[in-house]
């Protein structure tokens, strides 16, 4: 149960390998048979036998959907991955669908596919957008509700503007609105409180297109940020003197913001296994024009350091610590 909680499911949170239960399928069926049937998430007209026939192989057979994200060569990465971003489509179909959307002449092209599930229905491929009135609508409505509450408590007008654009994005699903949000988010540097909220990282998609949701609220560590800012203020010097080919050096380094923050709240894919640093946004064209925010999460870094130190139990009480 702890492994499932920590990994948000039956796949390792980092390696993506499936782990199977230590109890048997017969035991689980016995437990289900003694459970109030109204608590079992059956589909319309689905029988208990059909329900078990569908989920038991995925849970108990190591060879069935063995990886959440498969990156192996010469395999269809979509059909062999257990992620829930695609349904009844192949890797080739996904790639063609999104390649057809792209306009290489568009220098501010959005991250197509970031906030949707791709599904083939009746022979046609459609995007199911994650919006207030689309897929996951009830959950997204709650996100909008609390964002609007937060807007009333914002520290400055720029924060209010950022939150307003984000709620617009959740309502429409328009990825260009999300890019506009990201740009305005970069401009907000005066407040002590900052946040991340949205479909951000694409590690859970074998094709690197679709993002998982995460939420993160933080506040600045003033003294540690002062030290970090000294480095970022001299970013051009580091760029000019870096030991790389001059062809790859930027003549003008833009928008480097380095803060040390304390995490106040973690949610979604950011929890319970959290990063200790964040550098956003991910869109290359936004980073090139407007820069990025680079954040070290001080209290989590300290927690990892403390955990790595151990508690001295082995050294004190075990003759051979390697045992």
Task: Enumerate the language-model features and the residues they cover.
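Contiguous, non-catalytic segments that form substrate-binding/exosite surfaces or channel walls
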Residues: 4-322
């Amino acid at each position: 149960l702890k492994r499932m909680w920590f990994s948000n499911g039956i796949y390792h949170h980092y390696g993506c390998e499936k782990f199977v239960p230590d109890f048997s399928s017969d035991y689980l069926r016995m437990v289900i048979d003694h459970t109030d049937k109204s608590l079992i998430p059956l589909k319309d007209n689905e029988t208990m036998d059909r329900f078990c026939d569908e989920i038991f192989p995925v849970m108990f057979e190591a060879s069935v959907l063995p990886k959440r994200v498969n990156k192996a060569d010469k395999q269809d990465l979509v059909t062999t991955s257990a992620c829930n971003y695609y349904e009844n489509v192949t890797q080739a179909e996904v790639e063609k669908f999104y390649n057809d959307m792209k306009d290489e002449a568009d220098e501010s092209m959005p991250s197509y596919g970031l906030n949707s599930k791709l599904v083939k229905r009746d022979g046609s491929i459609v995007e199911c957008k994650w919006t207030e009135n689309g897929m996951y609508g009830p959950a997204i409505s709650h996100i909008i509700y609390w964002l609007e509450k937060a807007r009333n408590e914002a520290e400055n007008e720029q924060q209010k503007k950022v939150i307003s654009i984000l709620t617009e994005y959740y309502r429409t699903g328009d990825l260009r609105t999300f890019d506009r949000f990201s740009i305005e988010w970069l401009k907000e540097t005066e407040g002590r409180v900052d946040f991340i909220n949205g479909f951000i990282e694409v590690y859970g998609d074998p094709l690197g297109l679709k993002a998982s949701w995460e939420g993160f609220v933080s506040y600045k560590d003033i003294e540690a940020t002062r030290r970090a800012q000294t480095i970022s203020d001299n970013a051009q010097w580091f760029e000019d003197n870096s030991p790389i080919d001059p062809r790859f050096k930027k003549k003008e380094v833009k928008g480097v913001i380095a803060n040390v923050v304390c995490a106040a709240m973690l949610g979604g894919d950011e929890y319970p296994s959290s990063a200790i640093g964040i550098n956003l946004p991910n869109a290359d064209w936004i980073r090139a024009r407007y820069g990025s925010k680079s954040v070290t999460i001080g209290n989590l870094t300290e927690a990892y350091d403390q955990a790595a130190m151990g508690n001295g139990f082995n050294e004190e009480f075990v003759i051979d610590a390697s045992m």
